[in-house]
């Protein structure tokens, strides 16, 4: 392979991918299954695609010149790779809190129901 002069890593959060699956705006990688059941698309992404792509992403992390955030449709944001890595370094060296969410669709969520 020929390496380019600049590496732009385009990123989309898994939550946004799930939302686009639901709206039939996104298919699984190279499959063209826009109209397939959302749960099947999500499980394929969760168990196959995201595992493979996470490994690939690790090799690109130190090399990327820019990170392109594609989470807001038609409104991408871009930051220099060095600035992104510096922000991550700062984030992991101070307390932070993740915001939990519950998505009942994929794994059932029956235990949350009041019987």
Go through each PLM region and give its residues.
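Contiguous ligand/interfacial binding patches
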Residues: 26-40
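A short beta-strand element within the Helicase C-terminal
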Residues: 4-10
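Conserved nucleotide-sensing/catalytic segment adjacent to the nucleotide-binding pocket
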Residues: 1
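NTP-dependent small-molecule kinase module
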Residues: 10, 15, 23-27, 44-115
């Amino acid at each position: 392979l020929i390496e380019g002069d600049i590496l732009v890593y385009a990123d989309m959060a898994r939550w946004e991918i799930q939302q686009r699956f639901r709206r039939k705006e996104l298919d699984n990688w190279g499959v063209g299954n826009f109209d397939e059941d959302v749960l099947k698309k999500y499980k394929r992404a969760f168990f196959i695609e995201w595992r493979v792509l996470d490994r690939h992403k690790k090799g690109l992390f130190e090399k990327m010149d820019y990170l392109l955030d594609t989470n807001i449709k038609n409104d991408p944001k871009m930051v220099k790779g060095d600035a992104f890595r510096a922000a991550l370094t700062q984030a992991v060296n101070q307390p932070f809190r993740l915001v939990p969410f519950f998505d009942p669709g994929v794994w059932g969520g029956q235990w949350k129901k009041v019987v």
